[in-house]
Amino acid sequence: MPTRSPATRVPLDAPLGSRLHLFLLAAFSVCLQLLPLLNAEYGYFRDELYYMACAKRLAFGYVDHPPLAPFVLRLVLITLGGSVLAIRLLPALAGAATVFLTGSIARRLGGGTFAQSLAALAMAVAPGFLIFCGFYSMNPFESLLWTGCVYLVVRIVKEDEPHLWTLVGLLVGMGLLNKHTLIVYALSLGLALLLTPTRRHVLSRWFWLGGALAVLIVLPNVVWQVQNDLASLEFYRNANLLKNVDTSPVEVLLAQVFVMNPLAFPVWFAGLCFFLFSRQGRAFRILGLTYLFLLTTMMWAGSSRPDRMLAAYPMLFAGGGVLIAGFVERRSRWLLQGVIAGAVLVGGVLFAPIALPVLPPGMLVQYAEMLSPPRVEQGATARLPQWFADRTGWEEMAASIAEAQRLLPEREEGRVLLLAENYGEAGALEFFGPRYGLPPVLSPHNTYHLWSAEKDEAQTYIAIGLSEEELRGVFRDVTPVGVHRCTYCMDYENDLTIYVCRDARTPFRDWWPAMKWYGGARKS
């Protein structure tokens, strides 16, 4: 009878005190996310301004995302307020919970303290993970919900607890209500299930009950989509054609290595080998196949968004931690443990400045040029990486619009609306508008188009982000009155001419539908 390595002798009913190392790493993750907020040179991220607008208008769906994240943000705004710290606290906590679950998965796989700690540390310092837990969006919750699914699947496989499929269905349903692309994870898991001995669970009533629960949870969003002409499908189609960069399979793989910390690549690759080839991980082959199906889908789609697979890495880090720990136990234990964990940590430190707002913008420009992070969107250029550039210039934009508004004759006051090209501009003007006495804002972009259709017609519009040619197609009188400039924002948000538009050629109800744009921040 084979003996188990010391790395696998872990009592699964161990008290919380035995997982102190995981609590400490989770706390470390929270500190990584929140302490950089002391750097006041970076403000709200573009999407945060939009999500706060969505949270003010709760619905069962939005053009570019499902409803869960705005619902949760509404609770945050009610209880904690809308400061940068308040709205980023929950993403940081979701990230910490994901780190804790990563180590817990390693524990369920049979890993000891080092295996669990290595897995959790690798996840905590991964650049992509740091980026997407650093501002409010769907991404931190996607990672948490899917990692929770993986944890439950490991328990189902190892402990033969089929009733847990109902909880998997609950988390999948919530995941789909948070981000539609979780369907790719669910389908990959389902296909892997059919190709492994775990397929016997398909005959379990608990499996189908979980599936029914997932469908029931996401049903309100499906109804909203039908009522709104499948708006999200139009958004995804346009984003795929005009936003994402065509990427070769090799570039897709290299981007995965980059965003998950190049020095942690041996850990997650070891995790893949653990699930696919090792005797200890054979029972959990479903997880290795799930990752391969996800990666194949990314390569086939030529996706330039490496974050689309971010939620797949906790399970690989967990498996890698167990495999590496078993290898280390048979050799110079303490030395190898220090070298391996140290390498992962060094990689995290090296890439942290392009993931967290710790450097002043001027220094960050130079650092980013040295590391050259992958480009993820067409036409999206700036001196800073996009996830930092889109945290600058928004309040200055509101101030620029306020200056233009002061040029209007008194007789036009009260009959003015703002017209912004994209949801970032519209969200910024709506959020900072009261501070500068600005009127309501319209935008033809994504869900703002639906909201704006309910507005009354104005006599005068102050427009930003749209071209003079496009505006003259709608208004007879288009006058440039100012320019908005920002130093570190995205190029397409810099040097924007501000126009005052009057005398619409047709009534609002006729020209507004033609301006609709579902897709990325720019049409081209």
Walk through the language-model features, giving the residues of each.
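Transmembrane-lumen/periplasm boundary regions of multi-pass, lipid-linked membrane glycan transferases
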Residues: 183-284, 302, 353-357
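Membrane-interface transmembrane helices that cradle and orient dolichyl/undecaprenyl
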Residues: 107, 149-165, 271-280
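Transmembrane-helix signature of polytopic, membrane-embedded enzymes
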Residues: 2, 20-27, 102-125, 144
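Short acidic/glycine- and proline-prone juxtamembrane loop motifs at membrane-interface regions
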Residues: 128, 134-142
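Short hydrophobic alpha-helices at membrane interfaces in multi-pass membrane enzymes
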Residues: 152-173, 204, 208, 212, ...
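Short helix- or helix-capping micro-motifs
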Residues: 26-29, 119-127, 172, 176, ...
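Transmembrane-helix motifs of polytopic, lipid-linked glycan transferases
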Residues: 89-110, 148, 152
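Membrane-interface alpha helices of multi-pass inner-membrane proteins
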Residues: 57, 164-179, 214-215, 293-299
